[in-house]
Amino acid sequence: MKKTLKILGLTLAVLLGLLIAAAIILPLVFDPNQYKGEIIRLVKEQTGRDLKIEKKIGWSFFPRLGVEAGGLELSNAPGFGKEPFASIDAAGVHVEFLPLLSGKITVDTVYLHGLNLNLAKNAAGKNNWEDIAAKEAGATKPEPEKKEAGKPSLEGLSVGRLDIRRANINWRDASAGSTLAVRNLELSTGKFVSGEPLDLRLGFELARDKAAPIKAALQSRLTASPDALKLAKLDLKVDDSRLTGSMEIRNFASPAVRFDLALDRIDVDRYLTAEKTTGKPAAGGAKSAPAAVAGQPVELPLSTLRSLDVNGKFRIQEMKALGLRSQDARIQLNAKNGLIAFGPNQAKLYGGGYRGETVLDVRGKTPQ
């Protein structure tokens, strides 16, 4: 036992010594600020924009080894004024120390604090990011470099948690005369591993034109892979409403959707009133589809309906919509192979009740 403790203590002492040595040697032999000019030149070359780095790029050594920068600012596209396209108060990447000894890069934390992103479309319909997108699309992909022996490989790269604080995203559409802003966005996640669950926390305030802002907060256990997405222990709060439950999407090419959700209360009229106040549709200026002419049959999107694969339950404890109030609404949806069953559904309405089921069969040529 004493021998084991001695070995453990010696190992910790060696690791601590290596960390202290790195903290002393790295700033002496490598100053990232020497590359400020090169970074600014590359950004100008690749994007056509001017990058400012007002604060020094520095090292961090505790509790993780990392590099940090602050006072970042990227200029706007020509014709969109002096307001910066993006600015960041502080940003950094921290890596785990031990994996570096075996040539692996394990990112512990990526953080972004005080992001301000200004997206805009002018009266002519041109936006302020398409010039960057055009340059990226026209760039030729370099030949893959051959891996050198003993050189750390990005193949072992692992990304840890993401930490975004005090972010603001502003959208201004001069062609439609509308504005949209996501304010005080806070996002934190667990470690990113494809197919493995991670904790997700998201909060923000949404403001559109002159309408009252909407506050939202989300907590969930997220599992994502290239072909599936699952939200477990979902807890979403929007103003005075709270949605809980779970949902899952499998096979993005031909989605299979499963959900089990419960909403405590919602006042739909509150949001409809806000839409009337702004005089604009909730989608941010999109034109609504023309209404069907009375007496004429509505053409159903049969191919889309036949491909539906949905199974889920949705419960609403209290709801107000179009001046009507309902309680304990239970809604079920089951769609598979062209047979769509909406129900059995039920709800309490003004001392009475509703119970019913609707089935749509689109397996044949004529819907039934």
What are these regions (language model features)?
Residues 1-48:
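N-terminal type II signal-anchor transmembrane helix
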Residues 44-71:
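Short extracytoplasmic
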Residues 48-52, 78-95, 107, 175-188, ...:
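Amphipathic hydrophobic-ligand
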Residues 49, 64, 71-189, 250-307:
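Secondary-structure transition motifs
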Residues 60-62, 96-100, 120, 190-192, ...:
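Short beta-strand micro-motifs enriched in acidic
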Residues 114, 206-208, 238, 251, ...:
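Transmembrane beta-strands of outer-membrane beta-barrel pores
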Residues 131-175, 201-205, 228-234, 282-368:
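Solvent-exposed beta-strand/coil patches in large extracellular/periplasmic or lumenal scaffold regions
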Residues 201-225, 229:
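Contiguous, well-ordered beta-strand patches that form the walls/edges
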